[in-house]
Amino acid sequence: MNYWESHTQVAVRFRRFDRKRYAAFRSMHKVINIGVVTASTLLFALPDTAQAQKVIEPNRTGEEASVELEEVEVTASRAPIARNQATKIVTVIPAREIAAAPVTSIQDLLEYAAGIDVRQRGEGGTQADISIRGGTFDQIAVLLNGVNLSNPQTGHYSFDLPVNLSDIERIEVVSGPSSRIFGASAFAGAINIITKTGKENRISTDNYAGMHKLWKLEAAINHATTHFGQRLSAGYASSGGYIDNTDFKQLNLFWQSELKSEEADFQFQAGYNDKGYGANSFYSASYPNQYDKTRRFFLSAGGETHGKIKFTPKVYWTRHFDRYELFRSDPADWYTGHNYHETEVFGANLNATTQWKLGRTSMGVEFRNEGVKSNVLGKPMKEPQDVPFEKEGQYLKSDNRSNISYFLEHNVLLRRFTLSVGVLANYNSALNERIHFYPGIDASYRIGDNVRLYGSWNRALRMPTFTDLYYEGKTNKGNPDLKPEESEAFEVGLKYNTYFLRAHIAGFYRKGKNMIDWVKEKPEDIWESQNLTKVDNLGFETNLSLLPRELGNERFFIRKIELGYAFIHQDKDSEGYISDYALDYLKHKFTAQLSHSIWKGFSATWYVRWQDRAGSYTKYENLKPAYEEPYAPYCLVDMKVNWEYQRLNLYAELNNLLNSTYYDLGNIPQPGIWFKAGFRYSFKY
């Protein structure tokens, strides 16, 4: 029997009355709390309220456990709508599951979601290409506390974020085109990372070490008063690499602050991310000695007024630096120097939401400016500029574009029926064209108390990245005449939710045109960016989550069982091209999770992942292309053991327990079995 289960009084919090016959018996001999739901705004949109019953085990500070209905606010529309009425699949990964998972980065964590394709190039969060439902890594919006940090240079760097895993309160994954919610970059979906705020005076640390000279130190301090809360965190990680030239070093600094008053609430955040890593065969297997050095600075401020009409303004700024070395050492005679890139993004948005007798209406506007300076990307500059933070190098080229988006959405909420209609009106200065409209409609109908049927239709767009447009190198060539990608998507699904079981199944079809991809006709050719005629996705995904303890036996050793599966079929007209990204999609993915207690504070979490990728890659031998090799399916097993006592948590984890050989991207082997161990400690002051 778990120590905490036998010595801690269990508190049950009721936030919903379901009139079940057994409800009274489940409350016997327990402390009962009555909870009230509150809502706040994420992004410039108001979120929907997600309710999911979940057992909360003792946290690492040793405070009392509670069994309650988990209430999470997620951004699934521009106006607030309850989750049981929402018409999108939103995957929420809370802090408790993050702490229990055998991962070292956000990219690792997203591997366990069935609908997400994570293609790692290196470990420790160095670089990964992340896509949703058969899209590409450039087709998702990446947000930090509602601020869009998608990188206009390339999606390779969108996850250069200044936060540690211990900073994260939850991660929200919105599946499917969401341009009318998040703007043009949410072509295939969006990932919103929500960080913890300073709600109490606490100091915490999280540290670990492992094979391949891996180690990391994290520390955070929270401070709170009646109306003011803030959190400051820092983290540093390093590894010697699992094979030659896969070493890395990474630094994160992050500050977040909240100010609450009767009239309005305000949020501020700032961060810095610094990475340097060996990039063995990242972009071409002909050059295994590549290296990448990146920096990102980030600032934002926002607020939310109280009253009948809620205004949510936000301003933000981010600057990203990248030094890419084709030769980390011993360069070839023809090599003229490294590539230097600097992207700067700043923007402002305003959203207004009100509820009246005909429903809830939300409208807003966003301005976003994206610029690049480089010695490779863009148009020739009049005067060269020295590269900041570097001893050598000059910017010779640049480009800039502005995007203005107008949003309008209305929700009709009836007892069993929900209707949401909205439109994005988008103008981009690089297109020299009129405003383009991207509408969408979502509808759902509740069947009985626990089942909801839903359907949606949405249009979306994505602008080419600066890399798509301008990059030229030994193995790649951009195309300045690229058109924006456009798509039309349909989705139908069924959701089933009870206090112990949550399940959904969704079928989707996305019809795309002018899809951008890096392609070549023969293995010996270089990659060129082109608008493919069409790339259409047809598929479905399903998920089932079971909480056995909610059936009545709160001492049952199994805490959670979760199963997920996603299937995609891609119909493409590539005219015989070899594809680098879009055409080697993840066809099958199965995930399983088991979380259970062991004995006296010990618990374990197991993850199983099996996936089968379509397409092939060009196999290299002796640094030269040899033949096309189909991607082989593989299975991975990861596990983590935790021991908790009061404010201390000790843990050990094993990744790739079966020591499988596998590739996410061609010619870049992924790590074999990897052991790590560490501890977390926190205390109030």
Model-inferred region functions:
Residues 54, 239-246, 250, 264-345:
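Flexible loop and strand-edge segments within Gram-negative outer membrane beta-barrel domains
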Residues 53-99, 137, 304-306:
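Short, acidic, small-residue-rich periplasmic hinge/interaction motif at the N-terminus
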Residues 82, 197-202, 226-228, 262-263, ...:
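Short loop/turn motifs that connect adjacent beta-strands in outer-membrane beta-barrel proteins
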Residues 413, 417-419, 509-511, 531-619, ...:
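Gram-negative outer-membrane beta-barrel transporters
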Residues 283-307, 341-343, 432, 452, ...:
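Outer-membrane beta-barrel signature, preferentially recognizing the C-terminal barrel domain
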Residues 129, 148-175, 193-196:
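Short acidic/polar hinge/loop motifs at secondary-structure boundaries
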Residues 190, 195-223, 233-246:
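Short strand-turn segments of transmembrane beta-barrel domains in outer membranes
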Residues 107, 111-147:
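Extracytoplasmic beta-strand/coil segments of soluble accessory domains associated
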